[in-house]
Amino acid sequence: MPITKAEAQGVTRAFVRDYPGALELAYKFREDAAELYGPRAAEVPADMKGGYVPKETLHAGRAYRGRVDVPLQNVESASDLLMTLRHEVLGHYGANTFAPGEKRALLDGLAAARNEPTLKPLWDDVNRRYAGQSLDVRAEEVFALHCEGIEPSQHQVADQVQQRGQQSFTETCIARVRPMQADDLHNIVCMVAQGLRDRSRTQQNFPQFNELFRRDENMEPKKPFHEVVAEKLIEQLKAGTAPWQKPWEPGEPNAYLPMNPTTGKRYKGINAIHLMAQGRSDARWMTYKQAAAVGAQVRKGEKGTPVQYWKFSEEQDKLDDSGRPVLDAKGQPVKETVMLERPRVFFATVFNGEQIDGLPPLQPKKEQTWNAVERAEHILKASGATITHAAGDRAFYRPSTDSITLPERGQFPSSDRYYATALHELGHWTGHASRLDRDLAHPFGSEGYAKEELRAEIASMIVGDELGIGHDPGQHAAYVGSWIKALQDEPLEVFRAAADAEKIHDYVLAFEQKQVQEQDQQQSQAQDEAVAQALAVDIAEVLDNPDVSFSHYQAFQGDTLEDALRSRGLETVGSITGTDPEQFYAVAHDRLSPVFGIDPSHTDTDNAYLERKGLAQEFANMAEQLHLAQQLQQHGEQIVSSIDAEARWSDGQRIFAFHDQDGEPHQVRSLDELNNYAPDQLMALPALTQQQAAVADQEANMTPPTIDQAAALLAAHPADAVQGIEQAAAARRQLAAGEIDGQAFADATRQHLGVELPPDWSGELRIVGVAEQDGQTVDAAQAGIEPQAFQVYARKADAQFGEDAFAFVAGTRTEGQAEALAERLHLVDALGTDNQHERAAKLARVQEERVRRDPNATEEDISAAKEARKTAEASAMLNDSDAQRRAAELERQERDRQQAQPQAEKPERQYINVPYKEKDEAKSLGARWDRQQQSWYVPPGTDAAPFAKWAQGAATAAVEPRSAQPAPEAQGEAQKPAQQAQQARQYLAVPYEQRNAAKAAGALWDKAAKSWYVGPRADAAKLERWKPENVQAQQGPAMTPREEFAEAMRSAGLFTGSNAQGDHPIMDGKRHRVPVEGGKKGALDGFYVGHLDGHPAGRIINNKTGTDITWKSKGYALSDQEKAKLQAEAAEKLAQRAVEQDKAQEATAQRVGRQMADLVPIEQPTPYLQAKGIQAQAGVMTDREGQKTYIPAFDAEGKQWTMQYIQEDGTKRFAKDSKKEGCFHPVGGMDALAAAPALVISEGYATAAQVAEAVGHATVAAFDSGNLEAVAKALHAKFPDKPVIIAGDDDRHLVMTHGNNPGREKAEAAAQAVGGKAIFPIFAPAENTYPRDLPAITPDSFKTHLRAEQRLADAAAGKVELAGDEAAKLKASMLSGAQIAALSTMKQHTDFNDLAHKSELGIEGVKRQIGAAISQVQRDEQQHQEQKHVEKKQQQIEQRPRRAARIG
């Protein structure tokens, strides 16, 4: 009997309780397909149980992302409907929670595996039911069909589910390192299901109605990266066009190999080969985002090229002996770098410079001081290789004598050809056992010989480009056939060859690096000598300055200051300041301290402290002046004209002006200032080194990188916010110096920032999401509910035990607002720090956090920001002697503690049996991994109770203990010797990059344990450094083959562990039978055989379902830190999506433009204009009947992109597929807007027109609150000198019904974004305020009212029946008539149009309020400009160089 509608609704409610993400869909239950689809019912199968429509659906006033249709007559029971919901929601909707590129990869991975034994039964079923459908449709049906058997209990441990699902998705769909199996599909499905359960996944792919993300039917699934590369190179080898087959003439170094202009580094290894194989003439390659970051744009329709990278290390939290994270002084986890024993791969997509518009020209490389031939000759000599010249035309390397033979130099047509040949043979020479140790023992003409030639040839190409000596591959054409065969037999061979070629390149170029270092040292020494000579000025030059006085010294020390300095050998400026321009003041400070009888760390503000500081500053100033004069004399270039000056300024050169009154150089700081000088007063410094440029730009106790970084960080904030940050930072410095007290600091932060910071603020902030629960404000995360607001707290450094360590700072509505406030406060902390190194570290932390929050940031951007932060922190640490002393003391204490604990007293470890899939749970509880015993254990001092389920011998253990534990009898006698041997092994923690060294010392690889161990003939001393106790951080254990096999058995429906009536699987190479899911009681329908010999493998058969799996061990695992979402085609897909969107929007703009020809200007007000009480303005159109209103929308350049259509009843819509963001309508026209004294921007047209009537000039309609900020930014960029006013809507009624005021919030955000002012209408009393005598309305009470209203309406329509007194209870829960009326009144009074026509204040109220606001903004702008002018003049005065400061 079919299920009833009420029963179906009950099943669905239970389903969405299990999967709250399913609330994004509407559910439509009808008796049959005819009721669902009407005339189109014939288009669907008659026995269809359900259908998913990926189209936005409106129901009961709410928009849903899609709809599930269910014809009830085809659904037999609740369980039948449940499977239908899983199929449609978890399957089809779940597939659309992948981004388009990821879904494409998912379908490809499924299609590629359609003949795999574990998936073939599913595919056969789908092929039968969906014959004739595309491969994509059938692949998605396979995914959905598997979802029918998914239950919440199968994916309850979220972290493990996400890890396994992401690993399977990465390996089988993205990297495609192996075909998908049934267990992989199960892992991916569980990952999606869990995402819908915890609402971490939502729709990202938006196909058209009943249309999948399609591709051509004959398009084969994407091949693995190495196969794609190999096939391309095979084609080019046959055609003679492979990268290393192309000759090029000698010329500029680094002109041919692919490079990334953003990082300045070239691509290496197979990436370089693959990019060169694309046949581009431009050597520059970069990602889509890197191009956008420099203002360039990948052209529409261009396709990217994938490159791959390997990760050999990763950061992990450092743990103490109890397994808990080690925290630093600020409470943050300490990170440590772990070298991976099993490296991981990830991909990126790059575009060539020829595919990118607007890319800046490539900057020329730094010119070397020697030519290519000299460089090559030096490399040959520095290598020490034995090179002989003989008659004939043969060049070769002989391994037996370790020597190179070359023809006589005169036989070569040019010196470049000679050195190219010599360096090719030197490449072979590097393969000797004493160097890079490659396999060279192959006869001429053999396959092995050809492989070595491939390595040398690629290396020659790389070295030839590096040196600029050209490349001639003609002599090696004989190897082409062998190369093609090698790549056909093993596509990975070219990857190995390219990697070896890079090693050859590095080894060879290392000889040149010695020369570079020697030259750098000589240059540095010469520079130091030049600076020392410039600073060889007698100290009297400073001490005899009449503007300064150091009389206190003689009064207190009884000796003149000059005598005291000379007696200590300090007779010149350089002897006091040293010769390092970056350390002039610091060196002077330290060297002058003994003269004043105080320690360098002395900080008491007595006379000695003050005079030492003042004198050090005077000598540092003098040293800087002398150094600058020396640089100008050595490198300065006279500017010959104003055009020359502006050109040099644009090139970033430093320009100095010489005043007539003092003749001393003064650095020009702006283009306006530059124009104030005649050319003969100016001199440029184009040749400064980076270090010298940094010194020349040093000012105000800040290093140049700090200045630049601070300026860049501040630039993202409005001008008034920047001023507040700087003033609060100044107050923080004053507080630290004791110039103000804590209360004054708190007052200053309140005044300049709008929030109050505690005087003992440590610099740490905490953002907490909060919500209201049972009338109390609670931490949303702890309560397990969605946050309704966010609060910012500051840590108090001086909080005593028992006190609250955090002080409340402010509350915000959104997390973004809280993060923006936190960034401003962190900038206050950084800029308020005197120590330049600590300041730089704090600014680097702010920058890293900003990059991390940026949704457009790439992994490369995030990594670069992290490295910059780590570098800055290291610099701060190295320059903090106290911190170094504390660290050394802690290390000494820890070492003493360990030495004091005798070996015999170390507690015995408590080992536990942890299945691989539960390792993350055990690790989070504090368990540690013992590599020797191959088992997890509970660290001493850790509570063992949480680990009880894994205790050895526990009945709930899912798998057998690791090899350290005795094998169960069921494993059979044949396995015992192997297990005993494994148990006795001494395992090692060998990073992947050091595997060859360990292997050479006698280490062997254990395939089962995935770890190296000490071999029977190993050199134990050489392997000592890789013992686990000597390796600080190690990679986590890989899944054992037995655990992998158990996963495969479970995916095929076979029971394992205690459920299988024995401890299965038993990996002894024998046949075993076990029960299966759905099998009869006592039946053993499952068969398997598994072995651990060689490469672990096995076979699994489910005789009930017909599943037959041939299994092989994967051999490695990915950690949960990686969460690998490898996006080999992500940038390309984004570019394609942008191209399609641009095309659609351009087509719409043209269509709308043509439509304008059929419209007429408004002569009589349309129904909409009449309802709003506004007059017709030029530019607004109507139809020939004069009923509809058409409002064109333009961008800031005047191009029309779309149009707003307003029906007679006020219904509004925009042209389909049109561009609205940043578009607006200028009330009065674009010309009038350009002439307006201010930019007044409103939400809707009616408000903008009303305001235009009041102010008498053009205004702007942005159409809705969400578009205010984009319009304000576009117009502010167009008219930067016009003040901006946002005339916003004040939606007070929505605060009560929905908890927020979007009109006010969006208007304020838009004003803040452009430094403008937001204004809102002020109504007469009671017009826009809620009566105090009525009960308050909250979002919850309003929702309750709506639900009760709908329930009563359904009852009145006969749709539902109310039981007992339900109607009375529903009515009692509703809002009263007075409350509804008050809400209605408030809703009618929100904008300036309402103020003009619905308020008793009327149009005069609009004129008064708008006029006053504009006048005030204009006055403020005028004062701001005047203030800027005064500050500029003052800055010019302060920047005039002073020889000394007067000391009292």
From Swiss-Prot:
Basic and acidic residues biased stretches: 844-856, 863-872, 882-898, 1418-1441
Major enzyme class: transferase
GO biological process: DNA replication
GO CC terms: DNA-directed RNA polymerase complex
Keywords: DNA replication, DNA-directed RNA polymerase, Nucleotidyltransferase, Plasmid, Transcription, Transferase
Region (Disordered): 844-915, 952-982, 1414-1448
Keyword Aminoacyl-tRNA synthetase: no
Cited SMART domains: TOPRIM
Disulfide bonds listed in the record: none
Domain Toprim: start-end pairs: 1237-1325
The keyword Protease is annotated on this UniProt entry: no
Biased composition (Low complexity): 964-982
Enzyme Commission code(s) on record: 2.7.7.-
Gene Ontology MF annotations: nucleotidyltransferase activity; single-stranded DNA binding
Function: Required for autonomous replication in E.coli. Transferred into the recipient cell during bacterial conjugation. Catalyzes the synthesis of short oligoribonucleotide primers with CpA or pCpA at their 5'-termini on a single-stranded template DNA.
Name listed for the protein in its UniProt record: DNA primase TraC
Species whose genome carries this gene: Escherichia coli
